[in-house]
Amino acid sequence: MQVLIIGSGGREHALAWKVAQNPQVDTIYVAPGNAGTALEHKVQNVNIGITDIPALVAFAQDKAIELTIVGPEAPLVIGVVDAFRAAGLPIFGPTQGAAQLEGSKAFTKDFLARHNIPTAAYANFTEIEPALAYVREKGAPIVVKADGLAAGKGVIVAMTLQEAEDAIQDMLAGNAFGSAGSRVVVEEFLDGEEASFIVMVDGENVLPMATSQDHKRVGDADTGPNTGGMGAYSPAPVVTQDVHDRVMREVIDPTVRGMAAEGNTYTGFLYAGLMIDSTGAPKVIEYNCRFGDPETQPIMMRLQSDLVELCQAAIAGKLDQVESKWDPRASIGVVLAAGGYPGDYAKGEVISGLPTQESAGQKVFHAGTETQGDQVVTNGGRVLCATALGNTVLEAQQRAYQLADQIHWNGMFCRRDIGYRAIAREQAK
């Protein structure tokens, strides 16, 4: 069996690594992939960009690809799933219409309101003056979001009115995020603990994946600007069984039903970014129409079921006939980033200390890497994700940092506290 994975990040490396464990799979093509996927057993990189949909379709037809899994959001929002389905090619992901849940924050907030799904109070703006008037009326802290895709960086949590006004000016007048910021969503600041709740959806049935928690801020103790994610762990202890049941009942099920009722039947991975308050009540912060990055890395370390079988069941509309099995241990992924990220950073730095053989329960997933000759060099802001399993979150953290500390390049940095909330919970018991 031949499988195609679209993307080049740590998420796609983790998906490829997992798919390779299926004995029926002969070759996994990753378009365009990275240095890590190139070195993986059964995996080949293909030099096709993630938004070159005609080339992706032609390649899948040429290689008789039996399953395509889409990693990032950009190809989904421009209709890669629609194009593959039109060509009769099996693909797991949402259609262009369904991917609006991530592609437009204003669409999402209006959808949540229509279906009484809990979320922060908000308003949408395309003009500066009404937006400024709204934040002055509401006061800080307040959240300002670019409407479109901004690689996870289009969200400003403004702790002062000045920060909120600057963000609105930047997005609506300064064009800080291009067309993604030509409309902004301003919403109330939510208190609580965040969790990533990822499920597989076949249009009707839902199969929950393991819970996780992402660390968005660049600095220790959640300081500094937002990033695409500096690390993650699974499971997220904030999601107790009660919270899990509430999320399914109050958020996931009405979302899947609502999308179907509106003619945008949802298939694919659905990721709800949630804020859980002190009473265990969830509110939706955002939806992503794909697996999170870096959450995929620790989640795939824990997944014991066959990912190919789960995706095929979903494509066939039979998710109610399968179940997912999980390693009971905790897993942590620590992102190793290029100096300057999430701002400007250098590329082409030579990476040393990468592990030469696999050790059980530890894995370095590649993201912004490429090979030059026999060297692996940096090629992005988030470069690697050192991931490990442990009997406790603390043990998983220690093993992940043990792996991370062997690796070096000029300017490398990482957060030193990934998993701190879960570790504090463990130690309080």
From Swiss-Prot:
The enzyme's E.C. designation: 6.3.4.13
Binding site for Mg(2+): 286, 288
Cofactors named for this entry: Mg(2+); Mn(2+)
PANTHER family named in the record: PHOSPHORIBOSYLAMINE--GLYCINE LIGASE, PHOSPHORIBOSYLAMINE--GLYCINE LIGASE, CHLOROPLASTIC
Lineage: Bacteria, Pseudomonadati, Pseudomonadota, Gammaproteobacteria, Vibrionales
Entry-linked InterPro entries: ATP-grasp (IPR011761), ATP_grasp_subdomain_1 (IPR013815), PreATP-grasp_dom_sf (IPR016185), PRibGlycinamid_synth_ATP-grasp (IPR020561), PRibGlycinamide_synth (IPR000115), PRibGlycinamide_synth_C-dom (IPR020560), PRibGlycinamide_synth_C_sf (IPR037123), PRibGlycinamide_synth_CS (IPR020559)
One Gene Ontology term from the biological process aspect of the record: purine nucleobase biosynthetic process
Domain ATP-grasp: 109-316
SUPFAM superfamilies, A to Z: Glutathione synthetase ATP-binding domain-like, PreATP-grasp domain, Rudiment single hybrid motif
Catalyzed reaction equations: 5-phospho-beta-D-ribosylamine + glycine + ATP = N(1)-(5-phospho-beta-D-ribosyl)glycinamide + ADP + phosphate + H(+)
Binding note for cofactor: Binds 1 Mg(2+) or Mn(2+) ion per subunit.
Similarity section: Belongs to the GARS family.
Top-level taxon of origin: Bacteria
Positions contributing to ATP binding: 135-196
Pathway terms, separated by semicolons: Purine metabolism; IMP biosynthesis via de novo pathway; N(1)-(5-phospho-D-ribosyl)glycinamide from 5-phospho-alpha-D-ribose 1-diphosphate: step 2/2
Gene: purD
Official protein name in the record: Phosphoribosylamine--glycine ligase
